[in-house]
UniProtKB/Swiss-Prot annotation:
Cell division inhibitor that blocks the formation of polar Z ring septums. Rapidly oscillates between the poles of the cell to destabilize FtsZ filaments that have formed before they mature into polar Z rings. Prevents FtsZ polymerization. Residues 95-142 are annotated as: Disordered. Interacts with MinD and FtsZ. NCBIfam families: minC. Keywords: Cell cycle, Cell division, Septation. Residues 102-115 have a biased composition (Basic and acidic residues). This is Probable septum site-determining protein MinC. The lineage of its organism: Bacteria, Pseudomonadati, Pseudomonadota, Betaproteobacteria, Burkholderiales. Residues 122-140 have a biased composition (Low complexity). It comes from Paraburkholderia phymatum (strain DSM 17167 / CIP 108236 / LMG 21445 / STM815) (Burkholderia phymatum).
Amino acid sequence: MSPRKSPFFELRSGAVDTLLFVVKTTDLAEMRAELTRRFEATPEFFANDTVAIDVRRLAENERVPLAEIATLLGSVRMRPIGVVADSTQHGWANEAGLPLLDARDPRGGRNHGDEAGEEAPGKPGAVAPKPDAAPPADAASNAQVQMQLPIAAQEDGAPQAAAEGVRIGTSSQTTVIDKPLRSGQRIYAKGDLVVLGMVSNGAEVIAEGNIHIYAPLRGRALAGVHGNHDARIFCTCLEAELISIAGIYRTTENPLPADVHGKPVQIWLDEEKLMIEPLRLT
């Protein structure tokens, strides 16, 4: 006999939408300096975002004080929720008092890159409370720390709206949003996403396919989030906080050129580089 469902709570298996903070050095001073350099101009950018500390890039004999790293992340207003570690690291990783998490390839299974045990550069990962960790993510640069962008969690394959009053029209692989998105709202589409209103600062649109925005883009736009390198972003006015395709991203810390800022543009990937080109609509 199966237990009767409780009207008060429910326990379910699920994934968590979070960032991965990939540690590649044991030098906390260098790590602190790099965080300051990258985020001091935009202190609110990752404010209150959850983050998992990923230590799988460290050598077998290297350890880091995870409690101090958690405090360091808190200083830039991130919220550490756990640690991603190899099985050989579990002993010391447990000492920080943070839960051990599993970062999996969002397409399912393990993602093997060009070298054994590595993923391709810049790919995001969904985080879930499982003990068997996936291989470490490779780095696209020589930076001391690496931020990976999140995959939005979802249930039953349905597109998500983070607030009431947003109308979602879905036709096969295309999701249409006919209202402006305010700060804090988030939309996820399994295929292409079309937005007819403004995406405000602090709002976020995420799609596994292309993103089309027929209004100013001032928040975040993440296309091709399951590793689709052919995805593109189109918008009629580019003023974005962040743009990303297949996990390769650009933020406001790198100002947009004058010929594309506030202009109609298309954005795509050329190998591992984001390309931004003005759209000539007339």
